[in-house]
Amino acid sequence: MKKSHLFLIIVAVLIIGWFFVRFLFGGNEDSWIKDSRGVWVKHGNPSETPDSVNEQQVAILCAENLYESFTILTVEISSQCLGTCGDYAIDIVHAPRTEEDNLIENQCEDYRSGNVSHFIELDKEGNVVRIV
């Protein structure tokens, strides 16, 4: 057998082996992943929704409702804490974020004191900037 044929067979076996290992151990393509803002989004068509994803989705809806209630009351929205939704503090920040947003005194008291574990940052228009 020629060396070139042997080389091609070895390359073909390696490629087939790589695909086998990739699909056998590569993990589930249908899952949930976090986008750049920290929001859980579907990746493919996951069969189940984890509790942490449901909790975050409920908190985002609650945050949107809090924001709407402040705007209906014609309260001027600036850099302030709107309240809490479950285990999330809801905070208004600049978009894009500034150093002022990182100051500890500008974070929600419930988050600073440990009453909640996460926070949702909204911009002045009510859009999610970041979730931690």
Language-model features, listed with the residues they occupy:
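N-terminal Sec-pathway targeting helices
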Residues: 1-12
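Low-complexity, intrinsically disordered/propeptide-like segments
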Residues: 9-11, 17, 106
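Exposed beta-strand-loop-beta-strand "reactive/processing" segments of non-cytosolic proteins
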Residues: 27-30, 75-113, 118
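Short, non-transmembrane alpha-helical segments in secretory-pathway proteins
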Residues: 27-28, 36, 45-79
